[in-house]
Amino acid sequence: MKPQWQQYIQIINQVVKPALGCTEPIAAAYAAAVARTLLPVEPESIAVQVSDNLYKNSMGVYVPGTGKIGLAIAAAAGALAGDAEAGLEVLANVTPEQVTKAQTLIDAGKVKVERTETDEFIYCCVSLTAGEQEAMVKICGGHTLIAEKRLNGELVFTADNAQAKATGSICDGIDINIESIYRFAQEVPFEEIQFILKASELNSKLSDEGMSKPYGLEVGRTMKNGIAAGIIGEDLLNKIVMLTAAASDARMGGANLPAMSNLGSGNQGIAATIPVVITAQCYKVSEEKLARALIMSHLGAIYIKSHYPPLSAFCGNTVTSAAASMAMVYLAGGSFEQSCYAIQNVISDSSGMVCDGAKASCAMKVSTSSSAAVRSFLMALSSQNVSGQGIIAKDVEKTIKNIGKMVLNGMSSTDVTIINIMSE
């Protein structure tokens, strides 16, 4: 296999992985669980410091297995019951009794959460104290990327430069672009990418959960009721929007099921997966072609998002859905050129969507971007595309660079304003 393709598979394995619950509070749970492995006794108090952006994405989302919202319960549950070996599934086996114990610690004022100034978008430092003993774990640059461990002030671990590489830079130094992703997805041996079908399995289960039970705003179930009432039809567009939103409903509503995430985001993993799966069903393609389309969607999303920092003011579901739309064109038998049209169309359609934290209404944003993906892939199949208008360049690679510039140079103050509004 080509060395370049091996790099692509390594990238996917690194950042497309199961995650139980919204990844920002789960980062605190994971840090707390790792810190607990250093402390010889159960903690009596917990201190959590996080970046503004991690704070923003933890304020309104349920922590799975707890039925509660926020960083305090995430850190307390992680410290008292988390599995430090489970990564983003750290809280998979938390019991109601352990949640009660964690809440007791919070009610006693023993769990403190505060924002801290840092240049990192993803930053979390958790300190556990018991008597005179203290264990500290610092996460920086990625949701499970441990930068430092200390016990009683003594450094016991520090990440080397390679380990400390931020997820936003994951494609640095790698020969990658939309065309190389497209060719890779088409030509790589099936057995090398068969693992990506796990994304279909996990995220489809979340969708089923969101359709069968009331989570969050019930965006998916509301659409189902509309179909049953004859108000809207069960066509491809509505089916994709309904089932994608349902998975996000369950995800943000605290369902105790993992999502296959994409670059640290469960919702974006859902947005990269469900529209592709439903389109594959519509066109009755083989399992192999579905796997190739999922690779195209997930790696395409990773590549586009590598042009700007994680947890910015820009909602990443937009560009994730652009990559999904590219894969949908492929499933429908379209050309590479038409796949590029799909990316251009989605970004033109919904690139103004901002991120104001992780919460139940993220399911609405997922539904919006997924709807854009369907419209855009249908337009692309008719060779209709946005080109040379606004931030959309004539070339898809230039458009992607423009998105990076817009977020990096134009949305920093937007991010600060959003966080300040949310903190009022």
From Swiss-Prot:
Paired cysteines (S-S): none
One term of GO molecular function: L-cysteine desulfhydrase activity
Domain of life: Bacteria
Gene Ontology BP annotations: L-cysteine catabolic process to pyruvate
InterPro entries for the chain: Ser_deHydtase-like_asu, UPF0597
Family of the protein in this entry: Belongs to the UPF0597 family.
Protein name: UPF0597 protein Shewmr4_2793
Lineage: Bacteria, Pseudomonadati, Pseudomonadota, Gammaproteobacteria, Alteromonadales
